[in-house]
Every structure is written in structure tokens, then in C-alpha cells.
């Protein structure tokens, strides 16, 4: 694993933007509280875009100057893949002219697919392409309609010209439900934000961070950058405070992109 890691990266964000103030204005008669969240704009997909097309664009960006024929596997993580019983990653593989003997895998069913899928690819230890692409849809007049965006990010993985490698990891699995979307449903059900923040992020995230640091044999003072995707503004800052992190916190991309679901961490 010491000689294997990320060798290249790419991204794609749809060109279209919607001003959040317009969303709040349209729903003010039934959800006046949205006005306080109506800052900036967010990305959204055009009529001919979806998780697959965005994945292809991000993959092509990541593969600039690279040999696609050297890939052994392709992974596609998303919660909004267009096909339920047809391998979406295989379509991406065809679009980027990958060799036909490549292994392809779809990773989904959770907005954590972006990180869990990347860990799977890193553990496999073979030349591969990992893509996270998502365009979650919020229920009309909900906070999610205001916050959700769209985008994709891709990483090439290999053992040559490594620019970032995995030095430690940890996972915490708990049946904590902050939101869910049942099979066949278009929109999600969300629990109250204070519950998610205080009982979820504030307790589970620090436990995972401390375990990852221990696995890497590092102290928090050795870390210079902290990336934590969250639909709740300020969640990353709150968790950083709990674990006594004083370095740079990656911006949440709220303005211009929005929260891109499974692709958020990679973006």
C-alpha cells in the first residue's frame, strides 16, 4: 500500500446554476423559513445530464495524459444512478474507451458511497479509476431543495507517479439514521437537524477520526487539512473543534456547487 495511491484526478460540475433566492421566493407562502438559507446559488443538471454523463466528464478529465488501456477496474459511486438493473459503471467504461477486460463495479445505497468506494479501490491495489457522481433531489420547499447540488469527481489509482497515498483509515458503523430514502421513492425523509448534529456528527465523527489517527500512528497536530462533507453548514467546524484540529478546513462548496451527495467528499 505504501507504493500505491492516487495518481491523477478530475472533476465535473454542471454549467447550470439556480439562485437560491428564487427557490425561497417560490415557496415563501408555505415555507418562509427558507429565506434564511437562500444564499448564493447551486448547480443542477440539464435535461441531458445525469450521474453517468457527469461521471464520464470527470473520468475524461482525470485521464488526461494517461493510458486508459492500463486500467484493470472502474468503480462508480452514486445514489442517483439511472439504472437499477444495468451496470452503470460499464456504460462509463465504454464511453471512455476502456479495455473490455476491465472489471466494473457500481457502489451505492448511501451518500457514504463516495468514501467507502474509494477505500475499496485503494484496498484492491490495482490500476483503476474511481468516480463519484451524484445529483440528489430535494423535496420541494425543503432545506434539501435549497442545499442540494450536483457534480462528479474522479481519481486514477496506481503505483507510478503517486500524488497521494493512504497512510491510515478507520470506519465506524452505527445504525444512526439521519435521513433515508426508501426504494422507489424520489425524495428523502430527514430527521431534525439538531438530532443529526448533536447525536450524529458530534459523537460518531470524532470517534472515526481518533481511530484513523491511531491506525496511522499520527497525532491531530500532524494533520494540516480536514475534509468533511456535510449537508449541515458548520458541521465540519464543530467536529474540528471537538477533536482539537487547528489546521485548514476544506470549504463545503455550498455556493456555486451545493451539496453533491456521494460526490461531495471527492469534490
Regions found by a protein language model. Give the residues of each.
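Conserved catalytic cysteine-centered active-site region
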Residues: 32-36, 41-49, 79-129, 133, ...
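Structural signature of outer-membrane beta-barrel domains
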Residues: 11-13, 81, 233
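Hydrophobic pocket-lining "lid/loop/helix" segments that shape and contact the acyl-thioester
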Residues: 3, 56, 60-63, 158-260, ...
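Short glycine-rich or small-residue beta-strand-to-loop segments that form or flank ligand, phosphate
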Residues: 72-80, 226-227
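Active-site-flanking structural segment that lines cofactor/substrate pockets
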Residues: 39, 46-64
Amino acid at each position: 500500500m505504501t507504493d500505491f495511491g492516487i495518481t491523477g484526478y478530475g472533476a465535473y460540475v454542471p454549467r447550470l446554476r439556480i439562485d437560491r433566492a428564487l427557490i425561497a421566493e417560490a415557496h415563501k407562502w408555505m415555507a418562509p423559513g427558507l429565506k434564511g438559507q437562500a444564499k448564493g446559488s447551486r448547480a443542477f443538471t440539464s435535461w441531458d445530464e445525469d450521474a453517468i454523463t457527469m461521471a464520464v466528464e470527470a473520468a475524461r478529465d482525470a485521464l488526461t495524459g494517461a493510458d486508459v488501456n492500463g486500467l484493470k477496474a472502474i468503480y462508480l459511486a452514486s445514489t442517483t444512478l439511472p439504472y437499477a438493473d444495468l451496470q452503470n459503471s460499464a456504460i462509463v467504461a465504454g464511453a471512455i474507451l476502456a479495455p473490455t477486460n476491465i472489471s466494473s463495479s457500481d457502489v451505492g445505497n448511501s451518500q457514504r458511497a463516495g468514501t467507502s468506494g474509494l477505500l475499496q479501490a485503494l484496498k484492491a491495489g490495482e490500476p483503476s479509476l474511481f468516480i463519484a457522481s451524484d445529483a440528489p433531489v430535494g423535496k420541494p420547499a425543503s432545506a434539501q431543495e435549497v442545499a442540494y447540488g450536483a457534480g462528479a469527481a474522479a481519481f486514477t489509482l496506481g503505483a507510478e507517479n503517486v500524488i497521494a497515498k493512504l497512510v491510515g483509515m478507520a470506519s465506524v458503523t452505527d445504525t444512526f439514521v439521519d435521513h433515508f430514502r426508501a426504494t422507489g421513492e424520489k425524495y428523502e425523509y430527514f430527521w431534525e437537524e439538531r438530532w443529526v448534529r448533536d447525536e450524529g456528527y458530534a459523537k460518531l465523527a470524532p470517534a472515526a477520526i481518533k481511530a484513523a489517527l491511531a491506525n496511522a500512528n499520527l497525532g491531530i497536530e500532524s494533520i494540516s487539512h480536514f475534509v468533511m462533507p456535510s449537508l449541515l453548514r458548520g458541521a465540519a467546524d464543530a467536529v474540528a473543534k471537538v477533536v482539537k484540529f487547528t489546521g485548514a478546513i476544506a470549504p463545503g462548496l455550498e455556493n456555486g456547487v451545493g451539496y453533491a451527495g456521494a460526490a461531495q467528499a471527492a469534490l
